[in-house]
Amino acid sequence: MSRLVLLISLVIVVASAAAPQCEVCKKVLDDVMAKVPAGDKSKPDAIGKVIREHCETTRNKENKFCFYIGALPESATSIMNEVTKPLSWSMPTEKVCLEKLKGKDAQICELKYDKPLDWKTIDLKKMRVKELKNILGEWGEVCKGCTEKAELIKRIEELKPKYVKEEL
């Protein structure tokens, strides 16, 4: 009986360790810290400025993360101090995300990147209209006047060479 409990506990620990936690948070903060000049890495105000500048160009999940921490003008609340101060102390981004931000707003660590589509096997005709619109949205494109599924598929096929990198 105790072996069974131990085995189940081990499986749960391994499964939770395999799933990346706070992946969007870590990536955004890593990108931001790479942009911060070496002389400003210990200044919370300078880090905050770089975060806000970086967040102006983000889309999708990264933009949602920026909204949650208050780095966007339209954000309702701001927890930027919970981000900038620990980063100025050289705290690792993973620790900032898991220990500081997750406690303030659990939604931050629930953000996950969408799995990339396998363009070699995907059948656009079998996808729902909402999924097709999401593909265009991820690319930052819109299909004005598209009311039919076939029109969305046509637009995706037109833009596919621009956004989908074919592997050799």
Curated annotation (Swiss-Prot):
GO terms for biological process: ATF6-mediated unfolded protein response; developmental growth; dopaminergic neuron differentiation; neuron projection development; regulation of response to endoplasmic reticulum stress. Keywords: Disulfide bond, Endoplasmic reticulum, Lipid-binding, Secreted, Signal, Stress response. Disruption phenotype: Animals are viable, and despite a delay in growth rate, appear healthy and have a normal lifespan. No defects in the axon formation or guidance of dopaminergic, GABAergic or serotinergic neurons. However, there is an age-dependent decline in the number of viable dopaminergic neurons under normal growth conditions. Up-regulation of ER stress response protein hsp-4 in the intestine, hypodermis and spermatheca. RNAi-mediated knockdown results in up-regulation of hsp-4 in the intestine and pharyngeal epithelium. Residues 1-17 form the signal peptide. One of its GO terms (molecular function) is sulfatide binding. Changing residue 75 to L: In dma1; results in up-regulation of ER stress response protein hsp-4 in the intestine and pharyngeal epithelium. Elevated expression of hsp-4 is suppressed in xbp-1 or ire-1 RNAi-mediated knockdown animals. Disulfide bonds join 22-109, 25-97, 55-66, 143-146. It is found in: Secreted; Endoplasmic reticulum lumen. Pfam families: ARMET_C, ARMET_N. Belongs to the ARMET family. PANTHER family: ARMET-LIKE PROTEIN, MESENCEPHALIC ASTROCYTE-DERIVED NEUROTROPHIC FACTOR HOMOLOG. Inhibits endoplasmic reticulum (ER) stress response. Retained in the ER under normal conditions and is up-regulated and secreted by the ER in response to ER stress and hypoxia. Following secretion by the ER, directly binds to 3-O-sulfogalactosylceramide, a lipid sulfatide in the outer cell membrane of target cells. Sulfatide binding promotes its cellular uptake by endocytosis, and is required for its role in alleviating ER stress under ER stress conditions. Has a neuroprotective role, ensuring survival of dopaminergic neurons during normal growth. This is Mesencephalic astrocyte-derived neurotrophic factor homolog. It comes from Caenorhabditis elegans. The gene is manf-1.
